[in-house]
Amino acid sequence: LTGAFTKPVANNILGALCEQKGIKVTTNWTVDSVEADRAVISSVTGDEIPYDLLVSIPPNLGQEFLIESEVSDVTDFIDTDKELLKSKKFENMYIIGDATNVPASKAGSVAHFEADVIAQNLMADIEGTDNYYRFDGHTNCFIVTGFEKASLIDFSYAVEPLPGMFPLPGVGPFELLGESHINYWGKLMFKWVYYNLMLKGHELPFEPNMYLAGKDTSLLRSK
């Protein structure tokens, strides 16, 4: 990564937050090895960083059996049309969640929004129409920042995370790319929402595709 986030607006805001909290962000750095006895990690270029507590996340890959079934790409994820969420090799196969190779986050919100799109497209197939919905890469995610505060990002394939209010434009109650106690409690509350509302099929005020209402789009125009 080139910063705290992959897109400029969020990178500037989250990068400043890291600096405020005394967190050093080391960019363009790929781990090559870990020396536990010295408590250092080394990069592929030979640079070293000492650590107190190391939390390492390995590269994500799909399952090997997908290669054998000839539905995957070179990373073992299923080769997926990023809008229709269909296999590029098998017309009657839909893919959802972490199994896809669409350029979106491997987040639970992505799978949820994909499910809404796929449900509509399955109905179109059953009814024999071409009234397909198209997934725009909609993703949102809480980021816990400490001391019972959190931030929130909401973005898509085409639109990067922007400041604003979510899910109700201008009302919220959650603040996009802002650090607040309400965001933190929203994250904690989501567990109850997931088990008691989402899994039971209740309607939620979250559209499968991202909307710009309530977001500071002037930051896009000024780029």
Language-model segments: residues:
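FAD-binding beta-loop-beta segment adjacent to the flavin cofactor pocket
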Residues: 76-94, 145-166
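Flavin (FAD/FMN) cofactor-binding core of flavoprotein oxidoreductases
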Residues: 4, 134-151
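C-terminal auxiliary extensions adjacent to catalytic cores
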Residues: 153-223
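A Rossmann-like FAD-binding core segment of flavoenzymes
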Residues: 1-76
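Electropositive phosphate-/nucleotide-binding environments in soluble metabolic enzymes
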Residues: 8, 109, 116, 174-179, ...
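FAD-site-proximal beta/loop scaffold in flavoenzymes
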Residues: 38, 47-116, 123-124
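Internal hydrophobic alpha-helix adjacent to the cofactor/substrate pocket in enzyme cavities
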Residues: 111-137, 143
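Short, electropositive alpha-helical surface patch
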Residues: 110-117, 149-155
